[in-house]
Amino acid sequence: METSFDFEKPIAEINNRIDDLKESSRVGNIDLLAQIEDLEKTRDELRQKIYGSLTAWQRIQIARHPKRPYSADYVKLIFKDFIELHGDRIFGDDQAILCGIAAFNDNPVVVIGHQKGRTLQENMDRNFGMAHPEGYRKAMRIMKLAGKFNRPIITFIDTSGAYPGIAAEERGQAEAIARNLRDMSNLKVPIISIVIGEGGSGGALGIGVSNKVLCLENAYYSVISPEGCAAILFRDGSKASEAAQAMKITAKDLLNLKVIDGIIKEPLGGAHYDPVATAANIKAVLNEYLCKYETMSCKEIADERYLKFRKMGIYEDVAEEKMNVKK
């Protein structure tokens, strides 16, 4: 059964009517082409209207669509000769994080991404894309290999957050993420991150300290989920749509706030409508940035990443003002 959200129901109803007319035309050998074309035109106009004015909450729903392409899907569509690498060499292999080496335009790269499952069993195996400490340690192990062999790193961010369970905390979840933030900051190879769905808090940032952070049009990047924010601020999780609007976590908001460096276009309705076209858009942007980094030194690459994060946010340097007053 096709998944559709409340705001998409008018489109789904027209699609059902089109299917009914096509079936009636086939069974009864009746020419209903004119009616079908009229309905298709109405549907296309409605799609333009609905998807052209999405709210923040509606975009978040699209980012969570069960048929939305995941990291493994983009790996197949964008890269060649992907070889997955497993394990953190300390505890185990976390399937919520996908890591490996691949070829991008015949050049070697390292690819890392959060990975959700399609079925219940796959989601159980991959913990719904919520990584344990061993997932972040595995990612860092592979990133250090990239640094050693001078290979660019591409990460796909798609998680509701790092796993908050007791076992994860006992094995050092906060330490693992903090170590990734520190060590990614010091890598001398270019890192490009793309938020392809959910960008949840430290779980996303654990593989997101990058030279360039890009966001698909309907993805989001946030310190907390809208439901969690609503539960804390409004004492009512059902006010998630209001929280989403106030949090400024959509791609457009993030670009305005200079948290991300660019927005990658999606097909009308979301990436799940045309994964191949979405992958082509991602590939074009990756090619543009990777070509740029070929001409930069290791120091320039590391300095760019450092300055990018130092410039984030709005702050006032009161220490300098106090020194001027004393003079």
UniProtKB/Swiss-Prot annotation:
CoA carboxyltransferase C-terminal domain segment(s): 38-292
Enzyme Commission number(s) from the entry: 2.1.3.15
A single Gene Ontology CC term: acetyl-CoA carboxylase complex
Pfam family, one: ACCA
Any one GO molecular-function label of the UniProt entry: acetyl-CoA carboxylase activity
GO biological process, one term: fatty acid biosynthetic process
Entry function: Component of the acetyl coenzyme A carboxylase (ACC) complex. First, biotin carboxylase catalyzes the carboxylation of biotin on its carrier protein (BCCP) and then the CO(2) group is transferred by the carboxyltransferase to acetyl-CoA to form malonyl-CoA.
Name under which the protein is recorded: Acetyl-coenzyme A carboxylase carboxyl transferase subunit alpha
Gene name of this polypeptide: accA
